[in-house]
């Protein structure tokens, strides 16, 4: 993805995502350099993943996230997930494909990228142009399986 404006648009959409009490406990790492891509790929080394031209890593910071008083639930992960979905939706809107990845080694990531103890990676979103003939297709559950009207 050579068009920096597309990446800027995607990040702007993520930046504007809602968060609990508007605390915005996230940080976005846009990985474009070959050296940093290699560091990232050590954390999740799959053939399809290593071909992506750009990655956005969504990190959360529990120290600045809202915490629900009734049960001490920290909302950093939830807020980061909302921002991650904004990334995926923005990418689709401008004709890019994305894949939200959580099956990576977060400790190796923190070591490779020197994250502070409070900041941690929640998701890696690979971005690129969609193949004309995709390698695989996913199925979705029928609406009747997942929706209850009350």
Model-derived regions, located:
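Small-aliphatic-rich amphipathic alpha-helix that forms the alpha element of a beta-alpha
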Residues: 14-15, 56, 71-112
């Amino acid at each position: 993805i050579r068009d920096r404006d597309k990446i800027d648009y995607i990040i702007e959409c993520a930046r504007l995502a809602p968060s609990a009490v508007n605390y915005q406990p996230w940080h976005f790492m846009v990985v474009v350099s070959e050296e940093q891509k290699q560091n990232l790929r050590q954390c999740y080394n799959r053939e399809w993943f290593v071909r992506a031209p750009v990655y956005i890593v969504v990190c959360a910071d529990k120290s600045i996230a809202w915490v629900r008083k009734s049960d001490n639930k920290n909302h950093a992960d939830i807020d980061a997930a909302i921002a991650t979905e904004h990334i995926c939706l923005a990418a689709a809107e401008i004709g890019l494909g994305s894949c939200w990845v959580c099956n990576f080694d977060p400790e190796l990531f923190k070591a490779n990228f020197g994250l502070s103890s409070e900041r941690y990676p929640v998701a890696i979103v690979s971005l690129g142009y969609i193949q004309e003939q995709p390698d695989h297709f996913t199925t979705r559950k029928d609406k009747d399986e997942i929706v209850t009207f009350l």
